[in-house]
Regions:
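Membrane-interface "cap" regions at the ends of multi-pass membrane proteins
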Residues: 15-63, 92-97, 101-113, 119-120, ...
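Membrane-embedded translocation segments of transport machinery
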Residues: 30-42, 202-362, 366, 386-387
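Helix-loop-helix connectors at the membrane interface of multi-pass transporters/channels
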Residues: 35, 140-169, 280-286, 291, ...
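Inter-helical loop and helix-membrane interface segments of multi-pass membrane transporters/permeases
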Residues: 36-39, 68-72, 105-124, 137-196, ...
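Loop-to-transmembrane helix boundary motifs in multi-pass membrane proteins
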Residues: 41, 47, 55, 171-176, ...
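Transmembrane helix-boundary motif of multi-pass solute transporters/channels
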Residues: 44-82, 275, 291-294, 298-301
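Membrane-water interface regions at transmembrane-helix termini and the short interhelical loops
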Residues: 68-72, 98, 113-114, 120-129, ...
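C-terminal membrane-solvent junction of multi-pass transporters and transport-like membrane proteins
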Residues: 121-124, 373, 380-392, 428-485
Length: 498
C-alpha cells in the first residue's frame, strides 16, 4: 500500500494552541479603536478574481478531478460537475464572499457580527486553515522536489516505482523541501495583500493557465505503440475523457457520482475554510460580487477541465485505461513514468508540469496562510510582518514533524471512513472530510434560517448591482445545501456507506 492515501493531495493536528489565547482573560474578538488598523485590500475586481482563483485552483484540480472523471463515467461526471458547480458551488462561494465584504472582518469576527451566539462557527471555520497549514507546505515540498529532479535531468530515476516512497521516507530531504516551500509562501504573505498576494497572483495565474493549455495541446499530439503492438493516441484518450459512459450505471452508482462531484466542488472552491471570507473582506464595495463569483468558477472549472485534457490522454497513450485508476499516486508515480516514456521531450514536459503544479500549490498555500495571519492580526492586534514571521517559524516546525510522519514518526492510523493513513492523512481527514462539510451545513442554516437569505442578497446587490440568480440562491441556501452537506458529512465520516 502506498504511504499516501485519501485526499492527501488536496492542498489542502488541530493546532489548538491558538484557542486558549482567544478565550483567556476575555480577549475581545472585535477590534478596539485603540488597536484598529487600516485594512488593506485588493485594488479592484481583477486582482480579487486572480487571488481567489489562485486559492481555488490547487493540486486537487490537477489529479483529483481527472481521476474522478476517469472513475465516474467521463463525460457523465463532467456534466454533473458543471451543473453542480453553477448551483451548489455558486451558492457557497457567494455566501462566503458576501459575508466577508459585508462585515469587513475575517471568519471569527464575521460570524460573531452576523449573530453573537454563532461566533463558535467562526472559530470552527478558523480551525480549518489552521489544520490544513500543518501539511500544505509538505505537499508543496514534494512538488518542489520533482522540479529539482527534472531540472537536474533525473527524470528516469523519478520513473522508478520506489522513487517517491524513497523520497518521502528520507527524513532530511522531505523536511528540507517542506521548509523551503513554507518560506516561499511566507514571503508572499509577508508583503501584504496588494504588494504580495495580488501582485504574485496576477503573474502566476496567467502563466499557469498558459502552461496547462500548452501541455493539454501537447497531450493531444501524443502517439504510442506498446509491446503488444497496440497503438493509442492522445485524441483517443480525449474521447475516453469526454464521452459519457453509462456502463454499469445504477441508482446507487449515480448517487456516488453525485457525491464525488459535490465533494470535488466543495474542496476545490476553498469554501467553508474562512479563505473566501477573508478575501471577501478585502473586496471594495464597487466590485460586482455576482460577476466575480462566476469568473472564479469559470477559471477554477476551466483549469480542472484542462487538467483532464492534459492528464487523461497522456496516461491513456502510454498506460491504457488501467493507468487512469492510480488515484493519488497519479501525480507523483504514474506521470513520471509517462514522462520517461517520451523520447526527447520527457524532461521538458515533466519540468513544465511540476512548475505548473507548484504555481497551483503556492497560490493555494498562500491563501491558507493569509487567512490564519489575518485572523491572528485581528485577535492579537499585531502587525502583519511580525505575525507572519511567528506563524512561519511555527508552521515550519510543524511541517517538519508532518514530513517526518513517513519516516521517524511513521504510524498507521485507522480513519473513520475505513482507510488507513499517516499523520498527514489524519490532518487532511479532520479538516477536509469532517470539519468542512459540517461547517458548510451550519453556515447554510445560519444564512438560510437565522439571518435570512436577504442578508447576503442585499450585499450582492449593493450599489444597484444585478443578481439574476437571487431566487435560486435563496432556495439553495435554505433547502438544498444543508441537506447535501449533511449527506456528504455522513458519507465522508463513514456513517453512510454506498
Amino acid at each position: 500500500m502506498s504511504p499516501v492515501s485519501g485526499d492527501t493531495y488536496k492542498l489542502l493536528t488541530v493546532n489548538s494552541a491558538f484557542m486558549p489565547f482567544i478565550w483567556k482573560a476575555g480577549i475581545p474578538l472585535q477590534e478596539t479603536s485603540k488597536h484598529k488598523h487600516k485594512k488593506n485590500g485588493f485594488t479592484g475586481q481583477l486582482g480579487f478574481v486572480m487571488a481567489a482563483a489562485g486559492s481555488a485552483v490547487g493540486v486537487g484540480n490537477l489529479w483529483r478531478f481527472p481521476y474522478l472523471a476517469a472513475k465516474d463515467g467521463g463525460g457523465l461526471f463532467i456534466l454533473i460537475y458543471l451543473i453542480l458547480t453553477f448551483t451548489f458551488g455558486f451558492t457557497l462561494l457567494t455566501s462566503d464572499i458576501a459575508i466577508g465584504r459585508k462585515t469587513g472582518k475575517n471568519s471569527i469576527n464575521a460570524y460573531q457580527e452576523m449573530r453573537p451566539k454563532w461566533k463558535f462557527l467562526g472559530i470552527l471555520t478558523f480551525l480549518v486553515p489552521v489544520l490544513i497549514m500543518t501539511y500544505y507546505a509538505v505537499i508543496g515540498g514534494w512538488i518542489t522536489r520533482y522540479i529539482a529532479v527534472y531540472l537536474t535531468g533525473q527524470g528516469q530515476a523519478a520513473a522508478q516505482d520506489s522513487f517517491f516512497t524513497d523520497f518521502i521516507t528520507s527524513p532530511g530531504q522531505s523536511a528540507l523541501y517542506a521548509v523551503l516551500f513554507m518560506l516561499f509562501t511566507a514571503w508572499i504573505v509577508f508583503n501584504g495583500v496588494e504588494k504580495g498576494i495580488e501582485k504574485y497572483s496576477r503573474v502566476l495565474m496567467p502563466i499557469m493557465l498558459v502552461m496547462i493549455i500548452a501541455i493539454a495541446i501537447f497531450a493531444m499530439t501524443l502517439k504510442h505503440t506498446d509491446a503488444d503492438g497496440v497503438t493509442r493516441t492522445g485524441l483517443q484518450g480525449l474521447a475516453v475523457y469526454l464521452t459519457p459512459s453509462f456502463k454499469g450505471l445504477t441508482l446507487r452508482r449515480l448517487l456516488q457520482i453525485l457525491l464525488d462531484a459535490m465533494s470535488q466542488i466543495f474542496f476545490s472552491l476553498s469554501v467553508s475554510m474562512g479563505i473566501m471570507i477573508t478575501y471577501g473582506s478585502y473586496v471594495k464595495k464597487d466590485v460586482d460580487i455576482n460577476a466575480s463569483v462566476h469568473q472564479i468558477e469559470f477559471f477554477d472549472t476551466g483549469v480542472a477541465l484542462l487538467a483532464g485534457m492534459m492528464i487523461i490522454p497522456t496516461i491513456f497513450v502510454f498506460e491504457g485505461v488501467e493507468g487512469m485508476s492510480a488515484g493519488p499516486g497519479l501525480m507523483f508515480v504514474s506521470l513520471p513514468k509517462v514522462f520517461a516514456s517520451m523520447p526527447h521531450l520527457g524532461r521538458i514536459a515533466g519540468l513544465a508540469f511540476f512548475i505548473m503544479a507548484a504555481f497551483a500549490a503556492l497560490t493555494s498555500c498562500v491563501s491558507v496562510l493569509e487567512t490564519i495571519t489575518a485572523n491572528c492580526m485581528e485577535i492579537f492586534h499585531t502587525k502583519r510582518k511580525r505575525t507572519t514571521i511567528v506563524l512561519t517559524v511555527l508552521y515550519a516546525v510543524i511541517s517538519v514533524v508532518i514530513a517526518l510522519g513517513y519516516s521517524i514518526f511513521y504510524v498507521e492510523l485507522p480513519l473513520p471512513n475505513g482507510s488507513i493513513g499517516q499523520i498527514l492523512d489524519l490532518m487532511d481527514y479532520i479538516s477536509n472530510s469532517f470539519m468542512m462539510p459540517f461547517i458548510s451545513m451550519l453556515s447554510a442554516i445560519l444564512i438560510g434560517w437565522v439571518v435570512g437569505p436577504d442578508w447576503v442578497i442585499e450585499e450582492v446587490e449593493f450599489g444597484g448591482r444585478k443578481f439574476p440568480l437571487r431566487k435560486l440562491y435563496a432556495v439553495m441556501i435554505r433547502y438544498i445545501v444543508p441537506v447535501i452537506m449533511f449527506v456528504l458529512f455522513l458519507q465522508s465520516t463513514g456513517i453512510l456507506s454506498l
